[in-house]
Amino acid sequence: VTCGVVPGLMMFVLFQNIQEDSTSVYYLTEEYFYMGFVPYLGFFITLASCYRLAKFNIDTRQTDSFIGLPTPANALVIMSIPMIQYSNDYEGLTTVLYNPYLLLFITAISSYILNAEIPLFSLKIKEFTWAKYKMQILFLIGSLFSFSLLGFVAIPLIIISYVLVSVISNKMMAKA
């Protein structure tokens, strides 16, 4: 439950911070459209996470892999946003992450991908054989390398690549 509530609350806080910082993008929109409710849209992540957890508990297909992004992975993506913003290592990226439209997009994509019917490979290794777990091992090595180079910025990139590698792998297996 924590991995669903905390990301929604964090997105709420991120939207509120944008309102308080009075960015020009936000106030330009405020002139034409009331934006006071926008922070509450962050809780769509919480609702989508609740739905995913309820669905996961009764779905028998998810024994060896996941269908849709697991809530802890989604929580990592959302929680990496403030870590990137406050690290000051990537000033341009920090500015981009203060854009309310980008945060709305992230909220929508996050809520969707939690419940999308996309099979994602599992990192659970039951019996270690290189042939069977080559993709998972290479993915973990690449993730560690990315994190060592980029720090917090690597977190959303790793999760996005996790989804993309899974989609590509599924398409390749479907053709075979």
Segments and roles (model prediction):
Residues 1-54:
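Multi-pass membrane catalytic core of lipid/isoprenoid biosynthesis enzymes
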